[in-house]
């Protein structure tokens, strides 16, 4: 017969393993290939071509909406390089712009650059999804912070793209951006 002192230890160890399992499974990386069978299939050459209009919100890490914005985008391709000229207007009346250069480097692989992006952005498509990661110089008040962006874009129909961007700094979540882009005629 085992002493009774071991029974609580067994329960504690079981609880420890259950918690450890959930912690490990919650850290499982979101994979682009999960979406490879989803339709409609995204084709960046087709969607990012012509005029687009986007509306979005920025949320802080608690989920509070801290900014709303509209973006007018003019997109074009020359060979395997896209130019996305973005003009932002925020709910407080402020404005900004960004010009992305996207380069197709493989069947489903892309690289991107922009004036406020550190280094090279990396992207990949599968099914209806486009996964895009980069470090952005983000102005906040009188300072600029380098923030990691992890964009997940999903083609909803031939004219609509839904985007969720997760922002982090030193591995900690700092906010999210939700955006809907529509092609204009």
What positions do the PLM features span?
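Glycine-rich, aromatic-bearing surface loops/beta-hairpins
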Residues: 150-185
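Bacterial signal peptide processing site
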Residues: 28-30
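Sec-dependent signal peptide recognition
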Residues: 10-19
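Central antiparallel beta-sheet cores of small beta-barrel/beta-sandwich binding domains
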Residues: 55, 59-140, 152
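A short, Trp-centered hydrophobic/proline-enriched beta-strand micro-motif
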Residues: 48-56, 163
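N-terminal helix-cap/turn-to-beta initiation motif at the start of protein domains
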Residues: 35-51
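C-terminal motif of bacterial Sec signal peptides marking the signal peptidase cleavage site
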Residues: 23-26
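N-terminal secretory signal peptides that target proteins for export/translocation
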Residues: 1-11
